[in-house]
């Protein structure tokens, strides 16, 4: 056996359990691998990059931003009332927000709340998107 490998093996034998756990953690982070045991009889080291891409595709978005896209002039007052009730802004601030469309009305809302807000604004005549 190569002397370099022999030295590494001897160093590994002298590690405590805590040091061995830290070594495994560092190897996983450095080489982007997963050293967890996947079956009773064997340990398989697998790259985690593939797993991460699959997780990202499966994850469902939980926080949404509501964007006020367009405000027809004829519906401006009705939309202004809805925006004030949603945001809690004063008349002046809500008017500035409505007049500066496209503009974010609310951020980081859950799916149900964002759909409800979108429906209220669309009923008032606004064009709204959820991102």
Curated annotation (Swiss-Prot):
Name of the gene this protein is made from: rpl12
Any GO BP annotation: translation
GO cellular component, as recorded: chloroplast; cytosolic large ribosomal subunit
Gene3D superfamilies: 3.30.1390.10, Single helix bin
Protein name: Large ribosomal subunit protein bL12c
Keyword Manganese: no
Family according to the record: Belongs to the bacterial ribosomal protein bL12 family.
Biased composition (Basic and acidic residues): 106-125
Localisation per UniProt entry: Plastid, Chloroplast
InterPro entries xrefs: Ribosomal_bL12 (IPR000206), Ribosomal_bL12_C (IPR013823), Ribosomal_bL12_C/ClpS-like (IPR014719), Ribosomal_bL12_oligo (IPR008932), Ribosomal_bL12_oligo_N_sf (IPR036235)
Pfam families, per database record: Ribosomal_L12, Ribosomal_L12_N
Organism from which the protein derives: Gracilaria tenuistipitata var. liui (Red alga)
Subunit text: Homodimer. Part of the ribosomal stalk of the 50S ribosomal subunit. Forms a multimeric L10(L12)X complex, where L10 forms an elongated spine to which 2 to 4 L12 dimers bind in a sequential fashion. Binds GTP-bound translation factors.
Residue numbers spanned by region Disordered: 106-131
A GO molecular function held by the record: mRNA binding
Function according to Swiss-Prot or TrEMBL: Forms part of the ribosomal stalk which helps the ribosome interact with GTP-bound translation factors. Is thus essential for accurate translation.
CDD domains associated with the record: Ribosomal_L7_L12
Keywords of this entry: Chloroplast, Plastid, Ribonucleoprotein, Ribosomal protein
Highest rank taxon of the organism: Eukaryota
